[in-house]
A protein has these predicted regions:
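Extracellular beta-strand-rich, repetitive "passenger/adhesive" scaffolds
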Residues: 1-139, 143-166, 170-217
Length: 217
């Protein structure tokens, strides 16, 4: 269990410079102040593996401050990963992540980069104050559901802002915010190999397939 409750704006850094850190038991994270709990961000070779049958969860104190960063992180096996953060927090999946089980994330801010998701993924962004632009390079091998639910702020939420994403399952885009969801923000050759289903409600500004002039899918 990692509890980050500092009086200064600091974080807990795990496996920061180490290669092949192995976790054979469940990981529990809490962060109510500071900069969160962050894995493997010290250099390009740092990495961590969560053993098959184990998962990551939010503890009883919650995760309301800072970043939960799963960088260079491999989740072995097929146990679902369910994470819900609040406050001004954010969840970062990748870069160089690999997730075997279903991934369900609810957070004010969500980013995904250069990661492979082998089971269904549900991402729910709950705050519209800040724009979230994921850098892309992800492969989604099952269905992806993107929910943007916020009644405040005019921040957009985008994917593939640099590298193309590959979607091998269906994509469900549900927008009930005050701005837009963008797929293929700034990258060429994004691949949609399943159906694309859009739901828009409230005062949302829509869903875009590509955005910048050089982007394509």
């Amino acid at each position: 269990t990692f509890n980050n409750v500092p009086t200064a704006n600091t974080a807990i850094y795990i496996g920061w410079y180490s290669t092949g850190v192995l976790f054979n038991n469940d990981i529990v994270v809490n962060a109510t102040s500071g900069s969160g709990v962050q894995f493997c961000g010290g250099n390009a070779t740092a990495s961590a593996v969560l053993a098959s049958g184990q998962t990551i969860s939010i503890g009883v104190n919650g995760f309301s401050s800072g970043i939960l960063s799963l960088r260079h992180f491999t989740q072995s096996g097929s146990i679902p990963l369910n994470l819900s953060t609040t406050g001004n927090s954010e969840v970062r999946l990748g870069p160089s992540g690999n997730f075997g089980g279903a991934v369900t994330i609810s957070s004010p801010n969500i980013y995904a980069s250069t990661s492979v998701f082998n089971s269904p993924v549900i991402l729910t962004k709950t705050d519209g104050t800040a724009s979230n632009a994921s850098s892309g390079g992800n492969t989604f091998n099952a269905d992806l559901t993107v929910n943007y639910f916020s009644s405040t702020g005019t921040g957009f939420w985008s994917f593939a802002n640099g590298l193309p994403d590959v979607y091998n399952g269906n994509v469900y885009s549900n927008n009930n915010s005050l701005d837009r969801i963008i797929f293929g923000h700034n990258s060429a050759n994004n691949q949609f190999n399943g159906n694309f289903i859009i739901t828009q409600t409230g005062s949302s500004q829509g869903t875009a397939l590509t955005w910048n002039n050089t982007a394509s899918s």
